[in-house]
Protein backbone atom coordinates (compact mmCIF):
# COMPACT_ATOMS: atom_id res chain seq x y z
CA UNK A 1 0.00 0.00 0.00
CA UNK A 2 1.33 3.41 -0.94
CA UNK A 3 1.59 6.11 1.71
CA UNK A 4 3.00 9.61 2.02
CA UNK A 5 5.44 11.14 4.47
CA UNK A 6 6.93 14.56 5.08
CA UNK A 7 10.70 14.83 4.76
CA UNK A 8 12.68 17.88 5.80
CA UNK A 9 16.32 18.55 5.05
CA UNK A 10 17.05 20.79 8.02
CA UNK A 11 19.18 23.95 7.92
CA UNK A 12 22.39 22.04 8.73
CA UNK A 13 21.83 19.66 5.82
CA UNK A 14 21.08 22.53 3.42
CA UNK A 15 24.10 24.52 4.61
CA UNK A 16 26.39 21.50 4.19
CA UNK A 17 25.17 20.86 0.64
CA UNK A 18 23.56 17.49 1.41
CA UNK A 19 20.18 18.09 -0.28
CA UNK A 20 21.18 16.21 -3.44
CA UNK A 21 22.50 13.29 -1.38
CA UNK A 22 19.27 13.04 0.62
CA UNK A 23 17.05 13.30 -2.48
CA UNK A 24 19.22 10.77 -4.30
CA UNK A 25 18.88 8.26 -1.48
CA UNK A 26 15.10 8.74 -1.45
CA UNK A 27 14.86 8.13 -5.20
CA UNK A 28 17.27 5.18 -5.18
CA UNK A 29 15.11 3.59 -2.47
CA UNK A 30 12.25 3.67 -4.98
CA UNK A 31 10.24 6.44 -3.35
CA UNK A 32 8.64 9.21 -5.41
CA UNK A 33 8.84 12.96 -4.79
CA UNK A 34 5.32 14.42 -4.87
CA UNK A 35 6.24 17.96 -3.75
CA UNK A 36 9.54 19.72 -3.12
CA UNK A 37 10.20 23.24 -1.86
CA UNK A 38 13.09 25.30 -0.49
CA UNK A 39 11.79 27.71 2.11
CA UNK A 40 12.64 29.78 5.15
CA UNK A 41 10.58 28.45 8.06
CA UNK A 42 8.51 31.05 9.89
CA UNK A 43 8.15 30.92 13.67
CA UNK A 44 4.44 30.00 13.53
CA UNK A 45 5.04 27.00 11.25
CA UNK A 46 7.93 25.86 13.44
CA UNK A 47 5.76 26.05 16.56
CA UNK A 48 2.95 24.10 14.89
CA UNK A 49 5.32 21.49 13.48
CA UNK A 50 7.01 20.87 16.84
CA UNK A 51 3.89 21.41 19.02
CA UNK A 52 4.35 18.01 20.71
CA UNK A 53 7.61 19.30 22.23
CA UNK A 54 6.13 22.53 23.63
CA UNK A 55 7.10 22.85 27.29
CA UNK A 56 10.16 20.62 27.00
CA UNK A 57 13.55 22.13 27.87
CA UNK A 58 14.84 21.93 24.29
CA UNK A 59 11.76 23.48 22.62
CA UNK A 60 13.23 26.98 22.29
CA UNK A 61 16.52 25.82 20.82
CA UNK A 62 14.65 23.49 18.44
CA UNK A 63 12.60 26.41 17.11
CA UNK A 64 15.69 28.60 16.87
CA UNK A 65 17.51 25.92 14.87
CA UNK A 66 14.72 25.07 12.39
CA UNK A 67 14.21 28.79 11.65
CA UNK A 68 17.95 29.56 11.40
CA UNK A 69 18.26 28.94 7.66
CA UNK A 70 16.51 27.49 4.64
CA UNK A 71 14.88 24.07 4.81
CA UNK A 72 13.99 21.73 1.96
CA UNK A 73 10.51 20.28 2.53
CA UNK A 74 9.29 17.32 0.50
CA UNK A 75 6.34 15.00 0.34
CA UNK A 76 7.54 11.52 -0.47
CA UNK A 77 5.28 8.68 -1.60
CA UNK A 78 5.63 4.95 -1.96
CA UNK A 79 5.06 1.60 -0.29
CA UNK A 80 5.76 1.97 3.43
CA UNK A 81 7.22 5.44 2.76
CA UNK A 82 7.21 6.42 6.44
CA UNK A 83 9.28 3.50 7.69
CA UNK A 84 11.38 3.41 4.51
CA UNK A 85 12.51 7.00 4.96
CA UNK A 86 13.07 6.59 8.70
CA UNK A 87 15.36 3.68 7.88
CA UNK A 88 17.23 5.86 5.37
CA UNK A 89 17.49 8.66 7.95
CA UNK A 90 18.80 6.51 10.80
CA UNK A 91 18.33 7.01 14.54
CA UNK A 92 17.79 10.49 15.97
CA UNK A 93 21.19 10.51 17.68
CA UNK A 94 23.63 10.34 14.77
CA UNK A 95 26.53 9.00 16.83
CA UNK A 96 24.93 6.57 19.28
CA UNK A 97 21.77 5.43 17.45
CA UNK A 98 22.19 5.92 13.70
CA UNK A 99 23.57 2.99 11.74
CA UNK A 100 26.47 3.49 9.36
CA UNK A 101 25.02 3.76 5.86
CA UNK A 102 22.10 5.90 7.05
CA UNK A 103 21.98 9.64 6.35
CA UNK A 104 22.55 10.55 9.99
CA UNK A 105 25.06 7.75 10.52
CA UNK A 106 27.13 8.91 7.57
CA UNK A 107 26.87 12.69 8.00
CA UNK A 108 25.56 13.58 11.48
CA UNK A 109 27.42 14.45 14.66
CA UNK A 110 24.89 15.97 17.07
CA UNK A 111 21.35 15.11 18.18
CA UNK A 112 19.92 18.56 17.53
CA UNK A 113 21.75 19.01 14.23
CA UNK A 114 20.72 15.69 12.74
CA UNK A 115 20.19 16.80 9.14
CA UNK A 116 16.73 15.44 8.34
CA UNK A 117 13.22 14.94 9.66
CA UNK A 118 10.75 12.27 8.63
CA UNK A 119 7.22 11.79 9.93
CA UNK A 120 7.06 9.05 12.57
CA UNK A 121 3.53 7.75 11.91
CA UNK A 122 0.67 7.96 9.44
CA UNK A 123 -1.10 10.42 11.75
CA UNK A 124 1.98 12.64 12.01
CA UNK A 125 2.52 12.47 8.26
CA UNK A 126 -1.03 13.61 7.56
CA UNK A 127 -0.79 16.48 10.06
CA UNK A 128 2.68 17.58 8.89
CA UNK A 129 1.85 17.44 5.17
CA UNK A 130 -1.21 19.64 5.79
CA UNK A 131 1.00 22.15 7.63
CA UNK A 132 3.80 22.31 5.06
CA UNK A 133 1.81 21.68 1.85
CA UNK A 134 -1.82 22.70 2.51
CA UNK A 135 -2.54 22.62 -1.24
CA UNK A 136 -2.03 18.83 -1.43
From Swiss-Prot:
Gene Ontology BP terms: CTP biosynthetic process; GTP biosynthetic process; UTP biosynthetic process
PANTHER family xrefs: NUCLEOSIDE DIPHOSPHATE KINASE
Subcellular location: Cytoplasm
Gene Ontology MF: a single term: ATP binding
Gene3D superfamilies: Nucleoside diphosphate kinase-like domain
Protein name according to UniProt: Nucleoside diphosphate kinase
Reactions the enzyme catalyzes: a 2'-deoxyribonucleoside 5'-diphosphate + ATP = a 2'-deoxyribonucleoside 5'-triphosphate + ADP; a ribonucleoside 5'-diphosphate + ATP = a ribonucleoside 5'-triphosphate + ADP
Gene: ndk
Amino acid sequence: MSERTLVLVKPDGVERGLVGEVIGRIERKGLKLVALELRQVEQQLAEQHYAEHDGKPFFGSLLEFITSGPVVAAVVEGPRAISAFRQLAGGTDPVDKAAPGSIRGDYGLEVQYNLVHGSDSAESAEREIKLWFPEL
